[in-house]
């Protein structure tokens, strides 16, 4: 939840910055985006959790590592979504607002942001769903979450209930489905509603 909120806020600012006219700013933000996209989240988790602890003598918990990594990843993805939504607007939208005498803040508030939100919201909700599903990776750095709890239940019942893994992982699948499906349906509904 913390990573999702931070990613949405920081990603919005990053996306706006990515539309800058400065080549240096665009180059730096593009490098950040591509670096984070190329690196698997699991590798980033290991780098933050094990690398920071060993190389910089920083004692960082698994939960903090997960928040850092998922915020970095979510910010990069959200930034690219915001950039894409802004740059997909026809140039005449900006020019028309300026021709009407709107200030830059009025132009964004009344013209640009409402259109960007229509294009962005379904994609942002899709990103939230992806982030939720990817959280299962944190079990590999010792964070206790639903997959880890499931594994502990399976381990403790392995001898008495041989089919425990089927039932536990099936339950975990249903839990992820119950969380992600409504979010996914909301994205589809908003996309359909705003496409008119």
Each PLM stretch: what is its role?
Residues 1-196:
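Transmembrane alpha-helices and adjacent helix-loop boundaries
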């Amino acid at each position: 939840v913390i990573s999702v909120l931070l990613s949405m806020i920081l990603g919005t600012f990053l996306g706006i910055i990515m539309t800058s006219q400065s080549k240096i700013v665009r180059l730096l933000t593009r490098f950040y985006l591509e670096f984070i996209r190329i690196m698997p989240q699991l590798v980033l988790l290991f780098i933050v959790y094990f690398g920071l602890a060993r190389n910089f003598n920083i004692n960082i918990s698994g939960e903090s590592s997960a928040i850092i990594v998922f915020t970095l990843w979510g910010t990069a993805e959200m930034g690219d979504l915001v950039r894409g939504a802004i740059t997909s607007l026809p140039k005449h939208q900006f020019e028309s607002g300026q021709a009407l005498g709107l200030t830059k803040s009025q132009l964004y508030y009344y013209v640009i942001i409402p259109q960007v939100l229509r294009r962005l919201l379904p994609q942002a909700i899709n990103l939230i769903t992806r982030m939720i599903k990817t959280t299962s990776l944190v079990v590999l750095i010792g964070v206790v979450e639903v997959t880890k709890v499931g594994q502990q239940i399976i381990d403790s019942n392995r001898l008495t209930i041989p089919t425990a893994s089927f039932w536990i992982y099936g339950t975990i699948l249903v839990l992820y489905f119950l969380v992600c499906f409504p979010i996914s349906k909301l994205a589809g509904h908003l996309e359909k509603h705003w496409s008119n």
